[in-house]
Amino acid sequence: MSTTSLLVQSLPVLAQGAVLTVKFAVLSMVFGLLGAVVLAMMGIRQGEPLEGFERIWVNALAWLARAYVSLMRGTPLLVQIFVIYYGLPSLGISLDPTPAGVIALSANVAAYMSESMRGAINGIARGQWLAAYSLGLSWGQTLRYVIGPQALRIAVPSLSNSLIKDTSLVSVITVTELLRSAQEMIAATYQPLPLYLAAAAIYWVLCQILEWVQRWYEKRLSLPARN
């Protein structure tokens, strides 16, 4: 079989894998960003002049957030995927490959994004907090309506490209994303070079598309807020 015929025959299979890759990346980015916001909120109040039980509670949450981030950033993503998919069943928690992969990627993204999110929140002038408090807003309302929208503009997710590439790791738990689709075609045709190159080209195209979307999103966020 010629290389051209092979690629034409393999394209539908690779396209299905590419669609699943994009779904993995989008879901992981959304859930990871939500997790990053939670982790950032757990740590931003540390250092405030609090007293009694509230101080203990805030410090405990901040410590838990730091421990989680250190653990997730200090261990390989592949190991995290294995722990969730192969390790959790020993605790009675069995997950299908797809949700296990999404959870692993999301947990990893949350750890990496939380620090930039926390830095963005802390980068907002303290006077804006005080002004919101003087208007009667609570801490949560101030974060939601005043600080959060501004911090989001600073901490626009910047993991799009790496996340697309990281999705290839879920192939080890039998998720038929792009890399796994290419491997299945290789097993059937015994022609690894053109198929791996085709998969690499598709990864590159996906990264370029997401990079363009990210630049557009950053430009939208940089515009002054309008009602």
Q: What label would you give each PLM region?
A:
Residues 1-227:
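Transmembrane alpha-helices and adjacent helix-loop boundaries
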